[in-house]
Amino acid sequence: MNKNIRKIITSTVLAAMTISVLPSNLVVFATDGITENFYEIYPKPQEISYSGGEFQISDEINIVYDDGIDTYTKKRVDEVLEASNLEATVSNEIVPGKTNFLVGINESGGVVDNYFNKNIPHDESFFDEKMDANIVSVKDGVIGVIGEDTDSAFYGVTTLKHVFNQLEEGNKIQSFRADDYAEVAHRGFIEGYYGNPWSNEDRAELMKFGGDYKLNQYVFAPKDDPYHNSKWRDLYPEEKLSEIKKLAQVGNETKNRYVYALHPFMNNPVRFDTEENYQNDLGVIKAKFTQLLENDVRQFAILADDASAPAQGASMYVKLLTDLTRWLEEQQSTYPDLKTDLMFCPSDYYGNGSSAQLKELNKAEDNVSIVMTGGRIWGEVDENFANNFMNNISTEGHPGRAPFFWINWPCSDNSKQHLIMGGNDTFLHPGVDPSKIDGIVLNPMQQAEANKSALFAIADYAWNIWDNKEEADENWNDSFKYMDHGTAEETNSSLALREISKHMINQNMDGRVRPLQESVELAPKLEAFKQKYDSGASIKEDALELIAEFTNLQKAADYYKNNPGNERTRDQIIYWLNCWEDTMDAAIGYLKSAIAIEEGDDEAAWANYSEAQGAFEKSKTYGFHYVDHTEYAEVGVQHIVPFIKSMGQNLSVVIGSIVDPNRIIATYISNRQDAPTGNPDNIFDNNASTELVYKNPNRIDVGTYVGVKYSNPITLNNVEFLMGANSNPNDTMQKAKIQYTVDGREWIDLEEGVEYTMPGAIKVENLDLKVRGVRLIATEARENTWLGVRDINVNKKEDSNSGVEFNPSLIRSESWQVYEGNEANLLDGDDNTGVWYKTLNGDTSLAGEFIGLDLGKEIKLDGIRFVIGKNGGGSSDKWNKFKLEYSLDNESWTTIKEYDKTGAPAGKDVIEESFETPISAKYIRLTNMENINKWLTFSEFAIISDELENAGNKENVYTNTELDLLSLAKEDVTKLIPTDDISLNHGEYIGVKLNRIKDLSNINLEISNDTGLKLQSSMNGVEWTEITDKNTLEDGRYVRLINTSNEAVNFNLTKFEVNSNEVYEPSLVDAYVGDDGAKKAVDGDLKTRVKFLGAPSTGDTIVYDLGQEILVDNLKYVVLDTEVDHVRDGKIQLSLDGETWTDAITIGDGVENGVDDMFSTPLKNGYKHGNQSGGIVPIDSAYVEGDNLNQKARYVRILFTAPYRHRWTVINELMINNGEYISTVNDPTYISNPIEERGFAPSNLRDGNLTTSYKPNTNNGEISEGSITYRLSEKTDVRKVTIVQSGSSISNAKVMARVGDGSENVTDQWVQLGTLSNSLNEFINRDYNNIYEIKIEWTDVAPNIYEIITLNQEFEFPVNDSLKAKYDELINLSGDEYTLSSFETLKEALNEAKSILDDSNSSQKKIDKALEKLNKAEERLDLRATDFEDFNKVLTLGNSLVEEEYTAESWALFSEVLEAANEANKNKADYTQDQINQIVIDLDASIKALVKETPEVDKTNLGELINQGKSLLDESVEGFNVGEYHKGAKDGLTVEINKAEEVFNKEDATEEEINLAKESLEGAIARFNSLLIEESTGDFNGNGKIDIGDLAMVSKNIGSTTNTSLDLNKDGSIDEYEISFINHRILN
């Protein structure tokens, strides 16, 4: 085909904004070297050529139709002409003198067919070989279309519709010819998504849109239509039929036909068990189809997706389809336009053709299209898939057929929050062989109008498959014009829509779908900004550039919101348009905050941060209905939103220090741009076995640094850098030095002139420096190396609270290299993480190689636990023969045990040894005993030591004595180590301080003497309660034993244990095999999943601890609906104690499934589809459930009742009570009523992170009031409380405090501190010694609270004495003496000062600013003017002057001064004497500068006279003949005209000059007129003729100057001129 394409790039700028747009590419074709204005036609014609000519379309058109052209095609012609306001009549012949519009069918023998045969050369095979073939010819006043049939002709007319939409004024049309056809037979879209169904208006509009671009199928398969699926056996009621009929008629009219899809396989499916049942069910389908045929439906489809295949096999599909084909063929006699093509979607719709089902289905007749999704649910139109499918599906005698692609794009079922506004070349691959495609339908979004860009793409692609990505991009770029207003014209609205759509493309899904790229131009700018921000460099200019970008996007969204080309589109995407506004406010606000931080403006930094935070929260509130719940719009999900989140997180550190001045946050910094392996938290964990390793690039440049920055200055006493990777200590800098910063920007060398070579461990002490950061920076480059960072320790304390230190580190053979994993995995307590080592010596591990632990000091060991091998890659890379050894000096080793694992299966080997007599060791290792040709894998190393376990520390000891006590703490118990010979004096105590306030369950206390001792508990260390019953306890953090007697008490402490009730996160207890992330099964996220890495056997179990006792009413086991690793036979059971189990769910029949079940999906094994869960389970998932269980449980397990050797086990979620949120912590520090929302825990109130928050669960607004209480457990001497809430939802909640002075005899009380009326709320407490609890009570508006900050003695109470003194000094001033404006400024400052003085919560900064403002207002007080004598005189004079008497220029200056003077006169009380005096000087000067106006003269007559003279010159000729003028006559007149023009053009010409010029010119004109030659001119002797006598008279007077009667040319003398004139007259 001819695809000689030229692109014309145009760019349009929005009138109301600046929008950066992609080029608008127009498809044009060059012929014969002629350049014309070519038409933009979609879908692109296969061949088009322009002849270079054009013609005018006549006002009235003559239309000629061949027989066979249907009414729908004729109606399309009418639409085309009416749109251009053209009238037409229909005739049977071409009419000369008119534009003829011809529409015909090839080989019809009609007028149009004959015209094309005679005038438009073409090959008849073109119509036989091509689909939907048509030719459009425009030339010589004839606009002609001929098609293979009426549908093809319709497509040709549709081509002309796009041409006519581009006609210029005057209706001129270019001459061209288009030979066109479709490359794919079936082109359209299917309503098969799971969201809200479209309205009939939506459906009709999309069918019309598709018809404009030659789509030919809309497949009706909405999930909510019961007659399509659940009630497929029932006929439609009449009211539903009328709706279907209307849509069918729209489909017939647009040729985008309504295809009715029936799903008879999911609910009460078609029966194939007996012929009688089958025939009965076939009859049901025929009756249904007959009903629809009678209502204009002309095409059908059968769906079997997401349903079980017939038990009798896939041949039943073929049987049904064949019988339906026969029946449809029979019906064609009644309905000639009925299509017998049958779409069929099998249950294996995401297969690759290799299944027995699809091979059998390939035996169906050729009219059957086999619908496939491209090899996976979110598949693509891909030639590789098509080739594989066709090859796999073929069997002997049945060659493979091309797939009919069902493409789930732009479907957003699994990305409901987003609009999918792009992805052309991702889902529709360029260059695919069209013979490999039977058809394509897109499955769109529930937002009908938003699909038009994708429908525009499939229309273009399926008609004329794109050759390359550029064509796909061009289509995307142009689509928004047609989506917005349906023509090729670019408008502000289409530009705006395209601009925001650039950033609404990505699906934000998992690996099951190829991610679509959005924000392509913006993303690199965002990344560059983040890197620059992280580096600490100035970001102001970059931030301003990004603000411009985001403002542009915000304006684009706003423009489209208010100026849509299509209001339906605007209304359907309004949630996203609104979201754009707030999302951009958030981005802009964060950037402005960053700028303010750089400029040191704390108030602006907080204000912008708070507004941004509120805007971002608000952006998540634009909810739209989705089936049975609300979803919330999100834009810019791939790059913009992550950028906003990143900025919010980064800024929160700095803003946090503004909100809480005493808060110090450490942040790891580096200018490496690659993502390291490991977690940045590893840097500060004081554990050298954890690390970060930078690998790409594998070099270290000069200037590369790693370090730490602080939100506020700290005192740096010592710093330690542990560099190099654990796998290779040489992965460090070649040379480096340490630097510190005081201001966060400028870096200073810590040790002048000191450099470290190949630093491994560096420590510098005794510094005593105030710093904001410290770093290690490379001073010399190093190639071929990674960069490892193990720890950065600042102000590390060498002393320890613990009785025994334990800091193990890894030891191993140095020749090994880490191939996969992180060595920190060996010490993380998780058997499912590990390391894979590459061995040297020809991939051989030599005898004597080892791996183990350096315990750091001699420790008594009671046991060891080593896990050799791992699951997954390298699972068989293990030693066969090895031994366990220990040593005290790393030289002399003692063997504990030898092992022979020869023949052991792949996977993990757990080595566990217990020692009856503890072993004292500092080193312990495994050592290889034979050479083995393998790499090596290890998963976990651990020791068991009662000495360590019971060593204790001082962290939880609570005492006011010098006793050497030690404590031990676990989550649910805190205790003191037994101690003898304790002596307590009066008021002394011993006890424990728990890690937080706890729900105390009981206390175990055993002492030898309790005389005079009392046991007490407290939540806060101030208020104490005596404990009388150790099993009935209040919440508390402190428990103490205090001597209340007056005598010393001596005793031995045998037991002091405080127990608490705790709940935990769900966790794995046990499983039959290892896994790749057990927590994912109980994390509440159905997108994550755990795989247990082995096939189950009968009796195998997977056991989870729910973390607490739960009343389970509903239990679901959820997996993806495509998951082949699902449980086939098993029971899911519940237990309260982990011993006694009750069945909740039964799966399968307990009989092992065969190998043929290996690729079966959950639905085929009896699971329910997600769409049956009422929105609880996603529609891409399947589940089994137990309902109405009403059982208390702590444990849940899967018990396998039959083996399945061919698959492992996957769990996406074990869902309790339909995903109901259950808190996984029992923390009485907070009391939330109602309970919080998931992810908004009360602990967020005190986590120091301004990006996390607490939010109560109002059950979608049903709960309208509540409270949250924060109980302080220490530092109750609070001076200031700061509460930060979301700026987007100001709650105005009451802030209450329970206060007291700490005295035993004084009762506490609740007082109100204030209300949450702002985003940042500050409350100062001067009146109470202690605040024990803070309670926030809300009504109507539930708060979203980021942080509660309390400040104690470090907060200095604001001092307002100076402000009050200045206020008192100025408040009584009288305004009579001062100018009004200066005194008004003072009043404003006084009012502000009073407001601040009256507000007990005013900060020092506010007080200081108010004082500064008051002082400035006082300084600027101006005394009023009193002397106006001169002012009045000069003003009176000025007002008396008349404007007309002076020049405009001088008056303009004067009038400005006069206006100012008059203004001063009106407001004399607002002027100082100096100002009045200056006005007098200025006004007097401007009066003196006035220039008198010269009277204007009238030049009209002179001008007219000049024009008269010029006319005479133009009309006259000099010569000797009658009617001519004497020679030289013009010269005299010309001279005078020039003189007159000089005067006329002189701006300051006087009236006298004008009159003189006029008189001179009048005389010149009179003289000129007197020189006109008449018949008698020269007849001096009066004889009535010119003769010799006249010549004699002239000759006689030659030289005379007095005889004027003979002077013909009036030059003052008789000369040769008169002789020549007389001679000429005599001779002629």
Swiss-Prot record:
Changing I1042F: In strain: CPN50. Residues 185-466 form the GH84 domain. Changing V250M: In strain: CPN50. The active site is at D306 (proton donor). Residues 1573-1628 form the Dockerin domain. Residues 781-953 form the F5/8 type C domain. InterPro entries: Dockerin_1_rpt, Dockerin_dom, Dockerin_dom_sf, EF_Hand_1_Ca_BS, FA58C, Galactose-bd-like_sf, Glyco_hydro_b, Glycoside_hydrolase_SF. It comes from the Bacteria. Keywords: Glycosidase, Hydrolase, Secreted, Signal, Toxin, Virulence. Its EC number is 3.2.1.35. One of its GO terms (biological process) is polysaccharide catabolic process. GO terms for molecular function: hyalurononglucosaminidase activity; toxin activity. Residues 1-30 form the signal peptide. Putative virulence factor which is likely to act on connective tissue during gas gangrene. This is Hyaluronoglucosaminidase. The lineage of its organism: Bacteria, Bacillati, Bacillota, Clostridia, Eubacteriales.
